[in-house]
Amino acid sequence: MGDTFIRHIALLGFEKRFVPSQHYVYMFLVKWQDLSEKVVYRRFTEIYEFHKTLKEMFPIEAGAINPENRIIPHLPAPKWFDGQRAAENRQGTLTEYCSTLMSLPTKISRCPHLLDFFKVRPDDLKLPTDNQTKKPETYLMPKDGKSTATDITGPIILQTYRAIANYEKTSGSEMALSTGDVVEVVEKSESGWWFCQMKAKRGWIPASFLEPLDSPDETEDPEPNYAGEPYVAIKAYTAVEGDEVSLLEGEAVEVIHKLLDGWWVIRKDDVTGYFPSMYLQKSGQDVSQAQRQIKRGAPPRRSSIRNAHSIHQRSRKRLSQDAYRRNSVRFLQQRRRQARPGPQSPGSPLEEERQTQRSKPQPAVPPRPSADLILNRCSESTKRKLASAV
């Protein structure tokens, strides 16, 4: 078994807690060497104490001997009173700090002090109980990772979803569900695996097992884009259902509809169908890195879930495979017509000249003059020839 180390640390946001007194904790998603992902909570005072100890352990890299040799990032000291504004404004600094830590030499980025600090503690597993008078308020980071004072104006109410069927977890990072369980969604990944919490549990759940409480439809699903986005398959997949597409690793496709359940509609030549999004990578990006980040299989599709039970009277609104195919074919035909030169479009300068000549009006043919007019206006020689002919 290899050495333990951290691959990546992402700041998810922060929580405003009221027990035992009001304070703020930051939420970090820590990805370990075995591709497991854990959420940990740390106060900024804890982070700053960790930072001070790290500088003492590596004085040269901290610039204590020569400031020019410093590679350990700076971290401002906490203030006497840190309010919500300070907690918000500090998120950008912490994001850069964690990113820099992971890029340091392994003797620092994999040292026991750093690994121990980001390991899951018993307190990280304690969630607020139902009998608490005031539950924590969750503030999530924007998608682009940049936080300003205007990005977060109030507590973000986590979206609530309901399980439509039982789900048995297949790894330690997942969470088991029973039909009717209500969960809060912390993160919606494009892979179709959502990070959720429920009472004293947290973990990844296939989005296909969840439905919104107020409607069967997912309001955040984008509209189809029949122009398509170029993607490359980073892992081979063989279709299981009739409306899916089989691809080999390295095949290029166009994505025409990105659905949140992790099954995107793709176009390969004139064929359309579903394909797991976690096996796709945008064209032109590093494929090897994306392949290393595949940590679990594709999530199951809702059509494959047995004994699914929805609380809604009507079913979800989904385009059929025929509708995708018709709309895609219609778009491709229109694009080909626009790209093909029209009958009035000249193909070369010579053709343009011929077209111009053909478009000019032809001169009118004058009427034949009468015999009297010819005799009156012709020369004497012509008159003698006409007279001899008669």
UniProtKB/Swiss-Prot annotation:
GO terms for biological process: cellular defense response; cellular response to glucose stimulus; cellular response to testosterone stimulus; epithelial cell proliferation; hydrogen peroxide biosynthetic process; inflammatory response; innate immune response; leukotriene metabolic process. Keywords: Chronic granulomatous disease, Cytoplasm, Disease variant, Lipid-binding, Membrane, Phosphoprotein, Repeat, SH3 domain. It is linked to Granulomatous disease, chronic, autosomal recessive, 1: A form of chronic granulomatous disease, a primary immunodeficiency characterized by severe recurrent bacterial and fungal infections, along with manifestations of chronic granulomatous inflammation. It results from an impaired ability of phagocytes to mount a burst of reactive oxygen species in response to pathogens. The PX domain mediates interaction with phosphatidylinositol 3,4-bisphosphate and other anionic phospholipids. In the autoinhibited, unphosphorylated state an intramolecular interaction with the C-terminal SH3 domain precludes phospholipid binding and interaction with CYBA. Phosphorylation disrupts the autoinhibited state. Changing R90A: Reduces affinity for membranes enriched in phosphatidylinositol 3,4-bisphosphate. Detected in peripheral blood monocytes and neutrophils (at protein level). Changing R43Q: Reduces affinity for membranes enriched in phosphatidylinositol 3,4-bisphosphate. This is Neutrophil cytosol factor 1. Changing S328E: Abolishes autoinhibition and promotes phospholipid binding. One of its GO terms (cellular component) is plasma membrane. Subunit of the phagocyte NADPH oxidase complex that mediates the transfer of electrons from cytosolic NADPH to O2 to produce the superoxide anion (O2(-)). In the activated complex, electrons are first transferred from NADPH to flavin adenine dinucleotide (FAD) and subsequently transferred via two heme molecules to molecular oxygen, producing superoxide through an outer-sphere reaction. InterPro entries: NADPH_Oxidase/PX-Domain, NCF1_C, NCF1_PBR/AIR, NCF1_SH3_1, NCF1_SH3_2, P47PHOX, PX_dom, PX_dom_sf. The keyword Cytoplasm applies. Changing S359E: Abolishes autoinhibition and promotes phospholipid binding. The gene is NCF1. It is a peripheral membrane protein. It comes from the Eukaryota. Phosphorylated by PRKCD; phosphorylation induces activation of NCF1, leading to assembly and activation of the NADPH oxidase complex. Residues 285-390 are annotated as: Disordered.
